[in-house]
């Protein structure tokens, strides 16, 4: 094993934990995704081990690591912390270095982040009060329909007669879905209707600039959402190679910039120590 510095980004969401390992040339050389569960620290350690093995690297070669996301303060090996808004923006701008709007559909929340042509944040909106339009919403609906979550994208693509749902609310939508089943509506048509609900919920949050990027685990596992969004917006959307990893990649990019100096960024963007 050749010794060389590597940089680690850890994004602990309420649903999934993601780790990205970059080399000094900012190339992604290792990554892993797992359920966050009820022990964020253990999830981070597990993903780190898998990521380092993929990168053919050891813990001793980690020059710096930054944590982000809901559980960022539960990562014992992190040398610094950054907010998820900063890291998602950083990760997306790495792949699309121009003025962009970012749609991030996560397990428990949705985010829209706007960056200027220099990568500076010019605005953002986040939906944290309700699970509607998130991965948790689709997970609940898949349980109601008694179908595996991973099969929803394929089913939506089979739809020939979309069934629109009248409610964004997870609780009311569950009742409405059961009623549609009772009426004899086909499952693929209902699933496509659920996808439409997710898209409408996100797009109503904020207006978007011409170059729009879609990221998040929901996008990674349900690429048909991107196709439907493009049809609704009437233009092509940008999707990074690893849409679920943008936050972790952004954190690793900050690790490259910051080095081993500890830094804890607060929610308002201020730092206890200079990054």
Each language-model region and where it sits:
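Glycine-rich phosphate-binding loop plus the immediately following alpha-helix
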Residues: 40, 118-161, 165-166, 253
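Conserved phosphate-binding/catalytic loops in two-lobed NTP-binding clefts
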Residues: 84-85, 230-249
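Short glycine-rich, Thr/Ser-proximal phosphate-binding strand/loop in the N-terminal lobe
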Residues: 3-42, 46, 121-129
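Glycine-rich phosphate-binding loops at beta-strand->alpha-helix junctions
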Residues: 70, 203-232, 243-244
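Short beta-strand-loop/turn "lid" adjacent to the catalytic site in phosphate-handling enzymes
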Residues: 30-36, 55-86, 122
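Glycine-rich phosphate-binding/hydrolytic loop that grips phosphoryl groups
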Residues: 138, 240-275
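Adenine-nucleotide phosphate-binding core of ATP-dependent small-molecule kinases
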Residues: 170-210, 244
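Glycine-rich phosphate-binding loop of actin/hexokinase-like ATP-binding domains
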Residues: 84-144
């Amino acid at each position: 094993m050749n010794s060389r510095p590597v940089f680690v980004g850890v994004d602990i969401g309420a649903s999934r934990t993601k780790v990205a390992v970059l080399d000094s040339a900012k190339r992604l050389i290792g990554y892993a995704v797992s359920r966050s569960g009820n022990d964020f620290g253990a999830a981070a350690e597990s993903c780190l081990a898998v990521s380092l093995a993929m990168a053919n690297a050891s813990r001793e070669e980690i020059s710096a690591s930054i944590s982000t996301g809901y559980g960022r303060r539960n990562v014992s090996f992190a040398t610094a912390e950054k907010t998820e808004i900063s890291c998602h923006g950083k990760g997306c701008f790495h792949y699309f270095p121009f003025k962009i709007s970012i749609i991030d559909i996560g397990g428990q929340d949705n985010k829209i982040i706007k960056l200027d042509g220099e990568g500076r944040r010019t605005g953002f909106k986040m939906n944290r009060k309700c699970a509607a339009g998130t991965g948790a919403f689709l997970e609940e609906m898949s349980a109601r329909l008694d179908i595996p979550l991973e099969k929803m994208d394929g089913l939506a693509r089979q739809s020939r007669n979309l069934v629109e749902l009248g409610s964004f609310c997870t609780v009311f939508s569950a009742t409405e879905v059961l009623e549609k089943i009772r009426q004899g509506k086909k499952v693929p048509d209902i699933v496509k209707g659920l996808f439409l609900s997710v898209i409408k919920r996100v797009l109503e949050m904020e207006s978007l600039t011409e170059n729009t990027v879609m990221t998040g685990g929901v996008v990674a596992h349900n690429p048909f959402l991107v196709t439907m969004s493009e049809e609704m917006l009437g233009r092509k959307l940008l999707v990074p190679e690893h849409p679920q990893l943008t936050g972790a990649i952004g954190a690793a990019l900050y690790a490259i910039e910051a080095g081993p100096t500890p830094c804890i960024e607060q929610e308002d963007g201020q730092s206890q120590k200079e990054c």
